[in-house]
From Swiss-Prot:
NCBIfam families, sorted: PRK09585.1-3, PRK09585.3-2
EC number: 2.7.1.170
Substrates-to-products reaction catalysed: 1,6-anhydro-N-acetyl-beta-muramate + ATP + H2O = N-acetyl-D-muramate 6-phosphate + ADP + H(+)
Lineage: Bacteria, Pseudomonadati, Pseudomonadota, Gammaproteobacteria, Chromatiales
Disulfide linkage: none
HAMAP family per UniProt: AnhMurNAc_kinase
Residues that hold ATP according to the record: G11, T12, S13, M14, D15, A16, V17, D18
GO MF annotation list: ATP binding; kinase activity; phosphotransferase activity, alcohol group as acceptor
CDD domains: ASKHA_NBD_ANMK
Function of the molecule: Catalyzes the specific phosphorylation of 1,6-anhydro-N-acetylmuramic acid (anhMurNAc) with the simultaneous cleavage of the 1,6-anhydro ring, generating MurNAc-6-P. Is required for the utilization of anhMurNAc either imported from the medium or derived from its own cell wall murein, and thus plays a role in cell wall recycling.
GO BP, one annotated term: peptidoglycan turnover
Stated name of the protein: Anhydro-N-acetylmuramic acid kinase
Pathways per UniProt: Amino-sugar metabolism; 1,6-anhydro-N-acetylmuramate degradation; Cell wall biogenesis; peptidoglycan recycling
Length: 376
């Protein structure tokens, strides 16, 4: 039987924990499952992220609660798939990013969802904390997805790019010539600003299908101001997060410029910002890109997808579904694959992407509790 792995993560929207049960080499998705994050837990997480201070007790409690929720998601996934824990080699858990700051003399990243708890409850060896070893080696700790994209989505026929639109958007450039290294970076905000803005004004977690953005009009003056942020002109390797691109950042620009817009017009402009920053990334880094594959939650935003197709008319824009991986499950598959890389002693980072001094084996291994495994 082919080896099976589980990938677990919660994205920057923090609306659910996603899990995928996969076989690798070749990749086959056996089952997927999501558990919504309760409003109370979500509000606690946002409060920790948005406040400049929090108590160690609060942080520790959230770590355990998320660990239990991640474990519950994995077990429900296995029940759905009628798969025993003994059939699973490992869980790759990204956790929930609370902070990611790759600049300055002391770069660090922090993800919650205690892997000890996950391993103990599930009885499955769990690999977690994937980003910090790359940071220790001088890298950005992100993006990590390009290594997975290269393994499963590279084409010998096309200069292809893969764009993951989560809270932050990251892109991988995959040259057709396999002798040419791939590269990639975070392009800037994906959904995070749009999610935050609609939450503030309509108390909704996401702009479903981009309908609210579609109801507004893009303000070109505001868009130009947003694009003057230094991040967009930084050369790669580079990474960013909601610590930087957030509503505080947006409010500062709105206040500084004095531009008065309706909330839907701001939403339309934020959608245009994601599109424009992606276009800038492609034109400056790989203008000969022939095909762009979209994955992540942004693939469900019709307004965003339509804008990308219009602005990137020089290449074919589609989703990863065309190549057998549903867009919403690419990241979960990525961490399942990274778990396998770690267990087998293979590096999971790409120094040409993250800027690390050398390839490194990512993450820490939390062995299964044999007593729990034997009962399942």
């Amino acid at each position: 039987m082919a080896q099976r792995y589980i990938g677990l993560l919660s994205g920057t929207s923090m609306d659910a924990v996603d899990a995928a049960l996969v076989e690798l080499e070749p990749l086959r998705i056996l089952a997927t499952h999501s558990i919504p994050i309760s409003l109370a837990l979500r509000q606690q997480l946002f409060a920790v992220i948005e406040r400049s201070t929090t108590s160690l007790g609060e942080l520790g409690a959230l770590d355990i609660r998320l660990g239990r929720l991640f474990a519950e998601t994995a077990l429900e996934l296995l029940a759905k798939a009628k798969c025993s824990v003994t059939e699973v080699q490992a869980i790759g858990s990204h956790g929930q990013t609370i902070y990611h700051w790759a600049r300055g003399p002391d770069p660090f990243t922090l993800q919650l969802a205690d892997p000890n708890t996950i391993a103990e409850i599930t009885g499955i060896t769990t690999i977690a904390d994937f980003r910090r070893r790359d940071l220790a080696a001088g890298g950005q700790g992100a993006p990590l997805a390009p290594a997975f994209h290269a393994a499963f989505l590279r084409s010998p026929h096309y200069h292809r790019a893969v764009l993951n639109i989560g809270g932050i958007a990251n892109i991988s450039f995959l040259p057709a010539d396999h002798r040419t290294p791939i590269w990639g970076f975070d392009t800037g905000p994906g959904n995070t600003l749009m999610d935050g803005w609609i939450s503030r004004h309509l108390n909704q977690s996401i702009d479903r299908e981009g309908r609210w953005a579609a109801s507004g009009r893009v303000n070109k003056t505001l868009l130009r101001y947003l694009l003057t942020d230094p991040y967009f002109s930084l050369p790669p390797p580079k990474s960013t997060g909601r610590e930087y691109f957030n509503l505080v950042w947006l409010d500062h620009i709105l206040s500084k410029t004095g531009i008065k817009l309706s909330p839907p017009d701001v939403q339309a402009t934020l959608c245009a910002l994601t599109i424009a920053s992606v276009k800038l990334a492609i034109q400056s880094s790989s203008p000969h890109t022939e095909e762009l594959l979209i994955c992540g939650g942004g693939a469900n935003n019709e307004t965003l997808m339509e804008g990308l197709r219009k602005q990137l008319a020089f290449c074919r824009v589609t989703t990863t579904t065309a190549y057998g991986i549903p867009p919403q499950w690419v990241e979960a598959c990525t961490f399942a694959w990274l778990a396998k890389q770690t267990l087998e002693g293979h590096p999971g980072n790409l120094p040409e992407v993250t800027g690390a001094r050398h390839p490194v084996i990512l993450g820490a291994i939390y062995p299964a509790n044999a007593a729990v495994s034997s009962r399942t």
